[in-house]
Amino acid sequence: MKEIPRQARNDKQGLKTLIMAEHNDLGKLGEQLARDFLIAKGYQILEQNWSCGHKEIDIIAMDGNELVIVEVKTRRVTFLVDPEETVDKIKQRFLIWAAESYVERNNLDVDVRFDIVAIVVDKNNEHRIDHIENAFYPMLSRRR
């Protein structure tokens, strides 16, 4: 973790800005690690940080004939929960909705899979990558 300047320690907004910058840097690192990891496994990367409205898909890839929607979660070792545990039902719905938009916009006729790439980074920037294939499935909507 970066050293926090003395002035920022006494300035709540400055501290918040530094923490967000660290968080964003960690997220970018995680997405690059995930991309490299998937390419090494033979995936074809189609999109990175694809957005539709205010929803974003971290990585869209092809694994054979299957379209893979990948949510990348990167955390420092100090977090109490594993990164993949932070992909809740709301986030899953957003990803499903965005994936449907991507498939429709690109007129694709493919099976879609939702994966999570969870990355834990230690203080020396060493990392562990867990790839959870079929991490969740689209839910049927309830009609009344």
Feature names for model-found ranges:
Residues 52-55, 125:
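Short acidic/glycine-enriched loop/turn segments that link adjacent beta-strands
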Residues 105-144:
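Domain-level recognition of nuclease-like catalytic cores that cleave nucleotide substrates
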Residues 4-5:
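N-terminal basic, low-structured, amphipathic or hydrophobic segments
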Residues 16-48:
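Acidic-basic catalytic patches of nuclease active cores, encompassing PD-(D/E)XK
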Residues 80-112:
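Mid-chain, well-packed structural core segment of small domains
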Residues 55, 66-68, 115, 130:
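Protein kinase-like catalytic core scaffold
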Residues 38, 57-79, 83, 87, ...:
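Conserved catalytic cores of phosphodiester-cleaving nucleases, focusing on short active-site segments
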Residues 9-13:
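A cross-taxon signal for low-complexity, glycine/charged-rich
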